[in-house]
Every structure is written in structure tokens, then in C-alpha cells.
């Protein structure tokens, strides 16, 4: 029998979804630690906080299943309390209260002070940048804005995250300096829309100015850009990328589709011609830039012709990095008023075809790297290999560089120089040269 009065509470934060959720969990954990709480990330704890995702169906299912798993553990006496926060809770709180009432309390995306109070902690305004990072020690996510003002028809993010709100440059720099002091060498800048940064605060797109301030932070060696938007992209960012070696020649810019009829229905504010020109301008401005994009197939009304236009365009553009997802019909979005008329098996078949095509493109591009020298950062040791990345690869989603651990010891979290000896579609094999 438990003697709860003698037991010290341990808070386990479970994170689901995207890098923005990772960041939010780290902020929560930093606040809890500052209040003297024993807090862990995805380990054993008698109090559980689940930071959920509510973006698409698969993510919602994972979040619901995780909630049910911990509610069952609560009923079995394995945990004492279960709290739920994040996007699913923001979007569906009334439904969740009705369907899963055994959760102790639900909190939305803007209710951090309330969540902390429920956990017996105080919200401290002065804790700018005091996060408890959960990523490997060499990199960290740095959120520069919250929310989104774009009207994309398929996307529920504005419902869960609200309007775009930029973080002041001064606050971002303070956070970056604190991360660097902890040994972080790579900053991955994230937002729903990086290209909008500054419009609300400074009345102009200010991403380039932010980058120029960040490169001055001592200890930071790489700065990576995630989640740009093709409309209104501030081209002065490319000037900074060319000029400053700390800015990775890498851009994650989700393009979603390329058929003009689908782009119009998606309310993306661009066309195939404009998008293609933008990408070609990127290539001219930064010749060795790696472009990552994501695509959606099976959007309402997507015909075989629309799909073939997309497929041929992927062949033409030869993206270095690409992900493809099937359309998810989301309540309260503009596209929800359209008929979800592409069968699920057709959606999946199209997504598989795009990824098979990308696998071949990636293999061909990787063959060109054999014999070349790259600076890599070592993220971890896994089995018989040290696993690293070049500046052209983001954690978890891109290529990895594998170094035979039996031949050379390299320190995790550090940079080293390697020569590529072999290449697969999404992996590079290398030997250390210095």
C-alpha cells in the first residue's frame, strides 16, 4: 500500500507532435524546475502531463491513445494524476471533458500559468529562456513566433495557436545566449511561419535582422531555418545566408502542392509559375542551398491530372529533402466544406509514389557526395556507428552520416570533418579525416 504523504511527487512530461511542442514542453519543465519540482521527460513519474498534438487525424489518434493509456495507469494505481495540455486540448476540450472525464484537468495552448498552478508551481515571468532542454546537448529548437495569419484552407493551426505573434529580438537573443552557455552549438529556428516574423512587432519582415543578431552569439556554430512560407519570402535572408557562415545553407519551406487549381483552393496565394521562379531564385542566390519541402496529396478535388502535374514537378525540381502526407479532413477549416472525395487508398498510393520518386532523387544526389569532405556534428552513438549530420540535414527528418565506431572514436555533441565513402538513399557513410 502506498504512503502518499511520504512520497515526493515526480512530474513526467510526455511530448507528442512537432518541434513546437517539444519547445513548449521544455518551457513547462523549466518553470517546474524553477519552482523546485522533480520533473522528467518521458520517464517514470506519479504525475503525468501529456502535451498533445491536434493537427491531423493520425496525430489526434496518437494523442487520444496516449491519454487513454495514462488514464488506465491512473485507474490501476500506477500514476496519481493525469493532466492534458497542447493542441488537442485547445481544439477539443469540451469533447475531451465529456469523453475522457478521468483526466484531472485539461489546459489549452495559452494556459501555462493555470497548468503550473495545478501542478503546485508558480509561473515566473522573469524566466526568459530558462528551458529544460530534451534534445541532444548540441542542438536546441528556438521558437521565434507563435500562431499564424495565413488563410490556408486545410490547416487547423490558427484554430489552436491563434494569430501570428513574434517574439522580440531582444528576448530571442537572451534565450540563445542561455542555450549557448549550456553548450548548445546549433539553433533550429521554428515558427508556424518564419517569413512573417516581425510584421506584427516592427511593421516589416525582420527575419534577416534577427539572423544578423543571432550570428553574434558566441558558441553558436549553426543556425537552421524551419517552416518558411513561399508568399512574401524576405529575399534579404538569402544575403545573410551567403554572408554568414553560421547560417546553414538550408531552408524548410512547405509548398503543399503545385497544381494551380489545387493551390487556389488551398488559398496559398501563389501559383506554379511563381513558386517555380522563387525556387530558381533561391538556387541562384545560394547555389549550394538544400531545400526541404512537404507536400499534400489527396486534397479535395485533386484529379489524376493534378497529381501528375505535382509528380512531374517533383521530378523537375529535384528537392534535396521532401516529405509527403495524405490530406486530413479537419473540422472548422475552410476545406472541410469541400467533399473529401479522393479515396484513402488512392491518397496513400499517391503519397507512396511521391516518396519512392524522392527516394530515387535522394539516392542520385547522395552519390554525388561520395569522395567529398563535410563538416558534421555528432548527435549520438547508435550500435556500431556514430551518427552525425551535415549542415544540410536537420535532426530526425533528414539524411544522417554514419561513422564506423570501431575505426574511429568521435565525441558526441562535437563537430568533426569527414569524407563520404558510401551513400544510400537517406544515409551517408563516412570516415573521419581530422
Where are these regions (language model features)?
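Conserved strand-turn element in the central/C-terminal portion of the radical SAM core barrel
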Residues: 16, 151, 155-162, 222-231, ...
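Terminal RNA-binding accessory module
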Residues: 337-434
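Radical SAM/AdoMet-radical enzyme domain recognition
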Residues: 181, 208-209, 216-223, 234-295
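Short, electropositive alpha-helical surface patch
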Residues: 202-215, 235-249, 302-320, 344-349, ...
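Conserved, mostly hydrophobic/aromatic
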Residues: 172, 189, 225, 253, ...
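Proteins enriched for Cys/Gly/acidic motifs involved in redox and nucleic-acid/cofactor modification
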Residues: 1-197, 236, 247, 251, ...
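Short strand-connecting beta-turns/loops that link adjacent beta-strands
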Residues: 44, 149, 258, 381-383, ...
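Conserved glycine-rich "GG(E/T)P / GGGxP" loop and the immediately following alpha-helix
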Residues: 54-59, 184-209, 213, 217, ...
Amino acid at each position: 500500500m502506498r504512503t502518499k504523504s511520504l512520497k515526493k511527487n515526480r512530474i513526467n512530461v510526455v511530448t507528442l507532435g512537432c518541434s513546437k511542442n517539444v519547445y513548449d514542453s521544455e518551457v513547462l519543465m523549466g518553470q517546474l524546475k524553477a519552482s523546485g519540482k522533480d520533473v522528467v521527460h518521458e520517464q517514470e513519474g506519479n504525475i503525468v502531463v501529456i502535451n498533445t498534438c491536434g493537427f491531423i487525424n493520425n496525430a489526434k489518434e496518437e494523442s487520444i491513445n496516449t491519454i487513454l493509456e495514462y488514464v488506465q495507469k491512473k485507474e490501476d494505481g500506477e500514476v496519481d494524476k493525469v493532466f492534458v495540455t497542447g493542441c488537442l486540448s485547445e481544439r477539443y476540450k469540451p469533447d475531451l471533458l465529456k469523453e475522457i472525464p478521468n483526466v484531472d484537468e485539461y489546459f489549452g495552448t495559452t494556459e501555462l500559468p493555470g497548468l503550473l498552478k495545478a501542478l503546485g508551481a508558480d509561473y515566473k515571468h522573469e524566466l526568459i529562456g530558462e528551458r529544460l532542454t530534451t534534445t541532444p546537448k548540441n542542438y536546441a529548437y528556438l521558437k521565434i513566433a507563435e500562431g499564424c495569419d495565413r488563410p490556408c484552407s486545410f490547416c487547423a493551426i490558427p484554430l489552436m495557436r491563434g494569430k501570428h505573434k513574434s517574439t522580440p529580438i531582444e528576448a530571442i537573443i537572451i534565450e540563445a545566449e542561455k542555450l549557448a552557455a549550456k553548450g548548445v552549438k546549433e539553433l533550429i529556428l521554428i515558427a508556424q511561419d518564419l517569413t512573417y516574423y516581425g510584421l506584427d512587432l516592427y511593421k516589416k519582415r525582420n527575419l534577416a535582422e534577427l539572423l544578423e543578431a543571432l550570428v553574434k552569439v558566441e558558441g553558436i556554430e549553426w543556425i537552421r531555418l524551419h517552416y518558411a512560407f513561399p508568399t512574401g519570402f524576405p529575399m534579404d535572408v538569402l544575403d545573410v545566408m551567403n554572408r554568414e557562415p553560421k547560417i546553414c545553407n538550408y531552408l524548410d519551406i512547405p509548398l503543399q502542392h503545385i497544381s494551380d487549381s489545387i493551390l487556389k483552393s488551398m488559398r496559398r496565394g501563389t501559383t506554379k509559375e511563381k513558386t517555380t521562379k522563387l525556387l530558381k531564385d533561391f538556387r541562384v542566390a545560394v547555389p549550394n542551398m538544400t531545400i526541404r519541402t512537404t507536400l499534400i496529396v489527396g486534397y479535395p478535388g485533386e484529379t489524376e491530372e493534378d497529381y501528375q502535374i505535382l509528380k512531374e514537378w517533383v521530378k523537375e525540381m529535384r528537392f534535396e529533402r521532401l516529405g509527403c502526407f495524405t490530406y486530413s479532413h479537419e473540422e472548422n477549416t475552410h476545406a472541410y466544406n469541400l467533399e473529401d472525395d479522393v479515396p484513402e487508398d488512392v491518397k496513400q498510393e499517391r503519397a507512396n509514389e511521391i516518396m519512392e520518386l524522392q527516394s530515387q532523387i535522394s539516392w542520385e544526389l547522395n552519390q554525388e557526395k561520395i569522395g567529398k569532405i563535410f563538416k558534421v556534428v555528432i548527435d549520438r552513438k547508435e550500435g556500431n556507428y556514430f551518427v552525425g549530420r551535415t549542415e544540410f540535414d536537420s535532426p530526425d527528418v533528414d539524411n544522417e552520416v554514419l561513422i564506423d565506431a570501431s575505426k574511429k572514436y568521435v565525441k558526441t555533441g562535437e563537430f568533426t570533418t569527414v569524407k563520404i565513402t558510401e551513400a544510400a538513399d537517406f544515409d551517408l557513410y563516412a570516415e573521419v579525416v581530422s
